């Protein structure tokens, strides 16, 4: 079997990457079980987004602390700073995050986060 790109996994990151590769590539995704059994699909929580620059330092510290300061700081910075664009991509792909009555995105606080910066879809964010 010949392929241009082999992606191991079928979770959110793998799917997002596949969607951002050139369409003329032959892409093969390999997963150990059905996609519906991936951790991403089964996830009930949400996805974090930098709401504004004032939250950057807190978001960075929360992420580093949750990773016991073993995280790669550059990767954490890249993840945080790119999160608004990633969320907009997901919305453009049709992900239906919860909204407030005024139509703005609804945020909640979960886990190690000190601020409300989690977007979610009901209690089935991974399926969405």
Predicted feature locations:
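A short, basic/flexible loop-to-alpha-helix module at the beginning of a structural domain
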Residues: 1-2, 110
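Conserved N-terminal/central alpha/beta ligand/cofactor-binding core
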Residues: 35-128
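N-terminal Rossmann-like FAD-binding beta1-loop-alpha1 element of flavoenzymes
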Residues: 3-29
